[in-house]
Amino acid sequence: VQLKYGFISVDDHVQEPPDLWTDRISRSRWGARLPHLERASDGAERWVVDGKVLLGGAVGKAGAFMPDRNCEPTRWHEVPTAAYLPAERLKVMDAAGVDYSALYPTVAGLAGEAFGRIEDSELELACVQAYNDWLIEYWAAASERFIPQCIVPLWPVEEAVKEIRRAVALGHRGVVFPSLPMHLRNVPHISGPEYDPLWAACEELDVPVCLHGGASPELQYPPTSGLNPRFAQALDAVTRPVSNVFVLSLYSFSRVLLRHARLRVVLAESALSWGMLYLEWADHQFEHDGLAREGYDLKPSEMFYRNCFFTSWFDQVAPFLSYVGAEHILWSSKLPLATSTWPRTRETLESCFRGVAPEAREKVLWRNAARLYRL
């Protein structure tokens, strides 16, 4: 892997353009059910798919590039070009000192959950495939510095596996998946064996499964509706990483991680601080509640160390190295979201890695990611 800056960001987002789905999917068949922009009575534009408004009525999520990072664009012409043009994003990456960038969606949801709510499986698959093709043709083709990651249909699992295989053959290097699909529509619980073919395919193809915090907003408490917008935004940002406690606990105790020894799981936007709590607490309850006598070969912490990665962008790293381990931490810039470290990414890195040995710093900032994505 060729590095100029020594930083691979594993959690950045692309802004999908207004014509992505309407140009790639039959409008004569699906009409207004396709993802598209609509103008509201107040003049603001909003994304709509299958009759549902997306992104809380915003046209995009690009707070880091806005004059006021707490105010998202409400019309397409307000969306900063670095959110949706690869050439402009590369300029920002150079200024931020980012060598490679692993890409997540925006309109499709943090993990594709916007399409997971579509009850019509044919429409869901069409939307998913259009996004996956576009990401390869538009972003990955623009520069090898972009790491494409596919989204998948939730059900049936056979279609999800077929799409993973198709997408990886196109060049996708990761699988972005809603951590709790049963929160989106009536599909089997994620802990059951129904999803084992999906995990097995990711093992076989050597691609990580990326579970993004916030893709299951039901886990975030308290709800932010009815609150002052700025208070709600701060509350959402604080509670989003901690929602991974439930996700990691479920994947451990339900034996998903136990059954799939070679599955690699990225907990995107997880942060680090709750990780120490989880690793101690989960092992304690594992023994205290008698799960250790239920035929588990590994404790929850051992499953984590074998399978998983935390992802942060702001934590002080040194306090967590002895417990979490440098081998299990990834770093991100979170472009172009309001929670991003931009435009102080370089300064933030130096502050966060104060007192960290060079070898550990390299693992967190790029070696782990280079190995994970086979760069």
Where are the language model's segments positioned?
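Glycine-rich, proline-tolerant flexible connector loops at the mouths of alpha/beta enzymes
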Residues: P105-E119, S179-N186
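Short glycine-enriched loops at secondary-structure junctions
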Residues: Y104-G109, G213-L219, L335-L337
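Active-site mouth loops of central-metabolism enzymes
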Residues: T74-A83, I118, F146-E158
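Histidine-centered catalytic micro-motifs
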Residues: I8-Q15, C210-G214
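Catalytic pocket-lining loop regions of alpha/beta-barrel enzymes
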Residues: L123-E124, W139-F146, V152, E158, ...
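Mid-to-C-terminal alpha-helical segments outside catalytic/metal-binding sites
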Residues: V1-I8, E16-E72, H77-P80, L85-Y100, ...
